[in-house]
Amino acid sequence: MEACSSKTSLLLHSPLRTIPKLRLCASISSEDVAHGRCSLTDQHLQIEGKNYSKTTFDHIFRTDATQDDMYTAFLSDTINSVFAGNDATVLAMGAKTNGKDERLYGNSVSRNGLVQMAITQLMNALDDNKDSEERIQVRMSAIMVSQNESSIVDLLSPFNPDPRHRVVKIVDDARTGVFIDNESEIRVETIDQALFYLNTAVDHRMIQDEHTHRTSHVFISLSLYSYKMGDKMQGGRRRLCFLDMGIGERNSTNGGMTMPALGSILLAMVQRNKHIPSRDSSVCQLIRCALSTSRFTTFVFSFGAKSDDNENIAHLACKIARTRAKSMVGHGRKSSGTMSTGTMESNSSSCGTTTITPGGTPRTQRRFELESGSELSAAETVIFLGPNSSRTASPASTTMPFTPTSIRPLHRTTRNHSGVEALSKPLSVETKSSPTHNCHDGCIHSIPPMLRGHTPFLSASLKLYDELCSPPSSSRASPAPPAAFGGKTSEKREDFGIMIAQPSIPLMKAKSKYNLDDGKMKQIMQWMETSEAPPILFSSPCYENSATSVEELRECVGILSHPLEDIIEQEEESMRTSTATTGGSKKDHPLRILSKQDLNVEPEIKDKQEENELELVMAASLSSMRSHDILAKLEAMRNAQNGNSVQNIGNSQSNTDMDVSEMDVYRRASHLEEYAMQRVREIEENKLKNKKKIKLGLNCCQQQSMISSGSTVVDWSQIERKKEKEREVHEEEMRKEMLRERRAKLKITELEIKRERNLIDKELDDKKGIANSIARQLQHFSLSPCRGGRTHRSVSTHRIDPPNASLPSTPTMSHKKVIGGSLAKLSASGASGSTGAPPSPALGYHQSLPRHSKLPTSVNGRRASAERERKSNKASRNSCSKERKISGSKEELQWRSPYAQMTSPKSYGGPGTSSSGRGSSAPGSDFETPVVSTTEKSANGTIPRSKRQSYSASSGYESANDYHIYSTTNKKPHILDKKRNEEKLSLVRQADEIRHRQWQLKKELEEAKRAIGQEDDAKMIANSSDQRLNGLSRTTMIDAMLQENRILEKRLVACRNHSMLVTTFI
């Protein structure tokens, strides 16, 4: 394939050197004028109180402007540019208003929409300019992009025969540009078909609320694929697009695109900038797909109820106008304020020129015979020029009507039908018998009655599917109902309309053969032989006439897909021509294998030459039976949903008055071969289980039907319920079995854990060791008596009080009595030993004694002297200072007492006369203050007062300090015990791991023994226990278990090797 051989031609048609034509239009509705949003003067256009120059817009359509005025202003030139080989786009932008919807889609016969007028004029022009050497095919697509959901919806997907249902996406390819992939491009042949698909897309747009309308955009395109046949074959594509855009979110709080963001994208596309804002968003990609290849773009702005939205639209229009003026001046052209009506300016770099004929019809002269918009704008379409790369320059022209002709209105489903009239002329119904399969043949142009009410893409509450999925039909009777497949057309049809509408002008005949080179023909034939094509129903003379060639038979049986159509396409007109040349052969019924007439054929008629024909007929009958099964299931599902009772069991008689178009609907309804094969497999599986079959009449549309006599169908609802019950029972049994297995495994694991736990407890249950450890710990807390005098060792004992003994406590009377009595005895004995001696001053106040010191007693008379007393006081002071040093050096190991700086209480000699200071009154304490008896008085007759003396932390709180010091000095034995316990626990853990590994090896060895047939050894291994290792030390037991694990591993390897050898010999 070669597109262009000359470098000059490539530069001439380069997109960078081609200036796209741009027009700006504004539409003012009656609502805008009534609410004061817009007003028009002689010089300015006032929008929301601000004046804008009228020269900003090429055309301003007032409230009294008609649709014909808009067609004359820009739509006729747009269609002319498409026929001249360019891509054209009409972009309508504005809020949701009645004025915008009426301008685009119309609402009555007198007020047709722009999209409908473009479709009508385009199809009429194709019929009027039909060329025998050129074939033009029109395909229609419609998608919707939602900003809120970030999704792309294919509005024509219900009519796409492709069973794969691939996801539609917009691809940004650096080599080919932006294009829409996997969209449903439906082939249209007549105006009514195009309007039917347009009706589907428009209904999606009409039912949207204001917010959804703002954030969604609808893209409708009509693609013209042209192929020129002759000594060489040329082809290309041009496209007419309509982009109905919203105005975006009101604010960007939720992350959506607003009107300024959309305006920046449009402005960047008009300015041909390399950097485009929001390049990765689906909305930006859709705008690029619509405007990147367009050579003739028209903006139609409309205004809404929000003042800020109207101001944003006006600012965007001004910016686009300034950009257009700069681009024209930069390329040496003078910008004109307003374009003349019905004309199109010539462009120095465009593909051709447009002139006005004397009759008022614009005629476009093209540089070459056939040019494509893709050739001039982008490189996304392959152009096949045949084996010869040279291009002829024979002039050709395309004539377009200047004024719009009679246009059929849209069959609106969301509007009032009072203004809709019948079609101007009826359409004849003809069923196509062409075996050539393309994207349009599998499309169902109307829906059977059983499917009505089941909306595949709208909500059930809207109830629009009944009229949405049926093209507009005429109430008049068809003048000449055709007789195809042996059937008749019913004249009293109200359930749905036409099937395939035939154009009013007969199609031109095409050549039966194509001038292709041998290499291309071989590739096509190889593809047709290797492709897997599902059987189809058709009646063709290819197998009626046995004298046909092998090539023609392959053309009839083979199914061409869309990629092969881009190279070469066989249209229905070529098959119609070949059918007419074969003579008046009578067409057989597609279900003739199920009728009695074909079952009673005499065997002598069948011969060897008709075997191929029989195989084709059997394939058709199999497809028909699949259709019956599918429709029967759909009918059963419909009856179950509506709550209707099952019809009476019986056999239905065949009806020969079946309408041909209705039978074609049933045949086409089963084109999804994957689903049909699945249903056939289910029938074969249930055939052995279900002995009793319920025979129901095939009443698919509750009208006249045609079924072979004796045909049986299955009650799919009952079968599905039974299968569902069996499936539930089976699943329940499987679940119970899994639970049982899990319970058994848990029991085994529990027994193993118990056994291991008993072994561990037995190893750790060493009573003698525990008793020794407890005895060693108690030795540190044992109470040892202090060494006192020689004769009175039990009088004074030194013991360690708990920490709470150091807290202040009030002395009780019982304590005082005991202390007073004991001291009285001591004083009496002392008086008898040394008469006339003064009382010891040590008995008059509290004295702090060092640890393990002796209490002062009166047994020895040597301690009664004052000199001894002073020495004892000096020694006590030295011991207190030493204890303070020791306590200071051990600050990090013990807590400092909060009462360290407190003084001892004042004692006035009598009970209950102590001060509020701290005094040690615990019974048996080493620091009790001797109480002076009441008999001892001073010289003046008063009780002598004790001296007040301050004590440090070692005086009254020696017991608390001793407790903390004891706790810190006895930490070393505890750390050693902890290390020993950790060693024991590590040995226990190691033993557990080895024991678990041994258990795993035993299990694997048991399975290996069973695999080679040694059941006895397997039982012995399973019943073996570890009781023989009891009583051993831990290290010995660990060594023994390691040795046993090595032996088990060797035995396991030997068993596995033995099993492999046996398997190899077998």
UniProtKB/Swiss-Prot annotation:
Coiled-coil residues: 717-765, 987-1021
Region (Disordered): 328-367, 387-411, 471-491, 569-592, 784-815, 827-957
Segments of skewed composition (Basic and acidic residues): 880-894
Gene Ontology BP term (one): egg-laying behavior
Highest taxon listed in the record's lineage: Eukaryota
Gene Ontology molecular function: ATP binding; microtubule binding; microtubule motor activity
Domain Kinesin motor, chain residue ranges per copy: 15-326
Biased composition, class Polar residues, residue ranges: 387-406, 931-957
Expression (tissue specificity): Isoform a is expressed in the AVKR neuron. Isoform b is expressed in the CAN cells and in the body wall muscle. Also expressed in the motor neurons of the ventral nerve cord and additional neurons in the pharynx and head.
Protein name, as recorded: Kinesin-like protein vab-8
